[in-house]
Amino acid sequence: MDFVVNKIEAISGSVKVPGDKSISHRSIILGSISKGTTYVRDILLSEDVQRTIGFFKKLGVSIEQKNKVIALKGMAIEDFRPYTQELDMGNSGTSARLLLGLISGSPHAYVLNGDPFLKKRPMKRVTKPLEQMGAHIEYLEREDLLPIKIKGGNLRGIHYKLPVASAQIKSALILAGLHCSGKTVIEEPVATRDHTEIMIQHFGGTVEKNNHFIQIKGNQRLLANEVLVPGDISSAAFLLVLSAIVPKAELMIEDVGLNPTRSGILHVLESMGARMEILEERVVNGERVGNILIRHSCLKAVTIEGDIIPTLIDEIPILAVAATQAEGITVIRDAQELKVKESNRIDTVVSQLKKMGANIEASHDGMIIQGPTKLKGATIDSEFDHRIAMAFAVAGMVAEGETKILKSECIAVSFPEFTEILKKISK
């Protein structure tokens, strides 16, 4: 499916973005292993999250869905039923990596697989420490890649230093650590998103954090709770940048998650000169939430590097679009993790923005962008990457002429209402 966009003149209105994808995944995972019934409200029912829901249904967890409310009757992991067929993770790296960690605590053997794109993404970064904890891993086709057969049980706690800053690896080991003997200690090179730690505490569990060290006691049983999922700041990022670069723009985005480990996008946009206000800030389920008001702004170039990168790794494609409209040279570095996302996002962003006339070059760990540039419409290959598709839809709305986004159905992975919201707020 293709998505065609044209230049717009104004943005206005008040909107809500879909529920946070990371929190939606984790609420299903933790609710499924908690004692009692968990209710999750305003959940993101995207393709990725549906993969996680489908996984637990196949293993015997009772999950009822009505609109955007999910009711889960949790069960002990040792009571998961055997499942001899492949468990299909689709294109969801979050599902694959976190669920490998979780089911390493089950005595049964399971096979996880994915679509052709997920099967290109590395998994040994998760399976290697799981093997150290005692899980049995078998690569059924190629080393490091799905499909993977995993058999767990009798895990032991370890001290593991993450080779890269990755919330998915960290979360997989935390979930395994809940079901092992002894204590698991995880050392991060820099802090990454901490939704898993926050939510485990919301479900009555214990996670200790001290600087870059996370400690998890083994053999914990969580207790059911209610979860209200805030709006996803990674989805809001597209609307924030669009509002900053469209000449006549003022937009309110309501009930957005403002977790400090995810809010790097806000700090960078402020550094670039974006006119933003955070209103009605509050705490829900241990997560900061608020409304964001943003207006058109004259942006200036910045350097994005170091510890802030993990807090905005998913927002770099849309920040690259913002940089094409900023005065000066924007440098993005320390972002080599972009190479193993749904696509190689460094190569994809650079090649597709060049089609639109941007002055941009790739580096080994990021990109360099000279702005401002008058973009021109082009045909964009999204590489089936949802964040690429949405970033270039935004670029197309400030470009002269028509922009066509190929394979735009991938947007449903995280933001099914994206095109509808664009139509609602655009003039």
From Swiss-Prot:
Record protein name field: 3-phosphoshikimate 1-carboxyvinyltransferase
Quaternary structure and partners: Monomer.
One example GO MF annotation: 3-phosphoshikimate 1-carboxyvinyltransferase activity
GO biological process: amino acid biosynthetic process; aromatic amino acid family biosynthetic process; chorismate biosynthetic process
Family: Belongs to the EPSP synthase family.
Residue sites binding 3-phosphoshikimate per the record: 21-22, 26, 166, 168, 314, 341
S-S bonds: none
Keywords noted in UniProt: Amino-acid biosynthesis, Aromatic amino acid biosynthesis, Cytoplasm, Transferase
Extent of the signal sequence: none
Organism ancestry: Bacteria, Bacillati, Bacillota, Clostridia, Peptostreptococcales
Active-site residues, record numbering mapped to chain: 314
Domain of life of the native organism: Bacteria
Record's function text: Catalyzes the transfer of the enolpyruvyl moiety of phosphoenolpyruvate (PEP) to the 5-hydroxyl of shikimate-3-phosphate (S3P) to produce enolpyruvyl shikimate-3-phosphate and inorganic phosphate.
Gene3D superfamilies assigned: Enolpyruvate transferase domain
